[in-house]
A protein has these predicted regions:
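Conserved nucleotide-sugar donor-binding catalytic segment
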Residues: 134-216
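Conserved donor NDP-sugar-binding/catalytic core segment of glycosyltransferases
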Residues: 95, 99-129
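Glycine-rich, basic loop-to-helix element that forms the pyrophosphate-binding segment
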Residues: 65-82
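Short beta-strand/loop segment that forms part of the nucleotide-sugar
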Residues: 34-42, 64-67
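Short aromatic/hydrophobic "clamp" motif used to bind/position activated sugar donors
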Residues: 87
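Cell-envelope/extracellular polymer assembly enzymes that use nucleotide-activated donors
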Residues: 4-7, 35, 174
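A conserved acidic beta->alpha catalytic loop
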Residues: 32, 40-49, 91
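N-proximal low-complexity "stem/linker" segments adjacent to membrane-targeting elements
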Residues: 1-28
Length: 251
């Protein structure tokens, strides 16, 4: 294992429209002790050509391209290849802020399991909204930070055998919850770590996908009354999706 501090993992599949912006945000980081691994799922567009452009500019970029079982399978491949002490998962249509990784490392301690911060939500009309991460204690029933707004110790991801592929949309929540329940030590910084485009799979309302929250709470025994907590969270999600989001789009 090398002494690289942060391994940035980006899963791609036909991501050419947005990938260049994501990779540029990595290059523009004030924090420079990183590697960036692109895990591609046999893209049919020019995703790999873009990746190779960045590899030619900077040896810290590298990639693999092979069939996978979805984004969390790609994420698992990524951490297994990673050489860094910390793992950061960046969406292929998202950006890490210029000082994002520096801000996280500024609050790092030897005992920390996860370092996390806030985010900017970027909407399809180009507008953005600052979104504060939830307190870590809420990890028992919801994903307190977005996975793009946090870094996790690689040793803990390995200890938990990575992402559970039974979860198509909430595997990041499942893994992060397991780490929280077993190891604790989530450290927060009130800084924006990422800019996230609000068009991803986890941002689309699909009740079957939301049921994964109930399944993982039961699996991890994270709350005393999982069904009650599930409906409490889902009510808030419904209000946000059907009332608050349309109001934002009308502004």
């Amino acid at each position: 294992m090398s002494n690289i501090k942060i391994s940035i993992i980006i899963a791609t599949f036909n991501s050419a429209k947005t990938l260049r912006v994501a990779l540029n945000s990595v290059m523009l980081q004030t924090f420079q002790d990183w590697e960036c691994i692109v895990v591609d799922g046999l893209s049919k567009d020019n995703t790999l050509e873009i990746v190779k452009e960045f590899e030619a500019k900077d040896v810290r970029f590298h990639h693999i391209s092979e069939a996978d079982k979805g984004i969390y399978d790609a994420f698992n491949k990524g951490w297994k290849l990673a050489k860094g002490e910390w793992i950061y998962y960046l969406g292929s249509d998202d950006q890490v802020t210029k000082n994002g990784l520096t801000d996280l490392m500024d609050v790092s301690t030897s005992e920390a399991s996860v370092l996390y911060g806030d985010m900017y939500a970027i909407f399809e009309d180009g507008s953005e909204r600052y979104v504060k991460a939830h307190p870590a204690k809420q990890m028992t029933y919801l994903m307190a930070p977005s996975h793009q707004g946090m870094i996790t110790r690689r040793t803990l991801i390995e200890a938990e055998n990575g992402f559970d592929l039974q979860f198509r949309v909430r595997a990041d929540f499942d893994l992060t919850q397991r780490i929280y329940l077993k190891y604790g030590n989530f450290i927060y910084t009130p800084k924006a770590i990422t800019k996230c485009l609000q068009t991803g799979l986890s941002n689309q309302f699909n009740f079957k996908h939301h049921l994964e929250r109930l399944t993982l709470m039961r699996k991890n025994n994270s709350v005393r009354f999982p069904l009650l907590m599930f409906w409490y969270v889902e009510w808030k999600v419904l209000v946000r999706h059907w009332i608050l989001k349309p109001l934002h789009l009308r502004k």
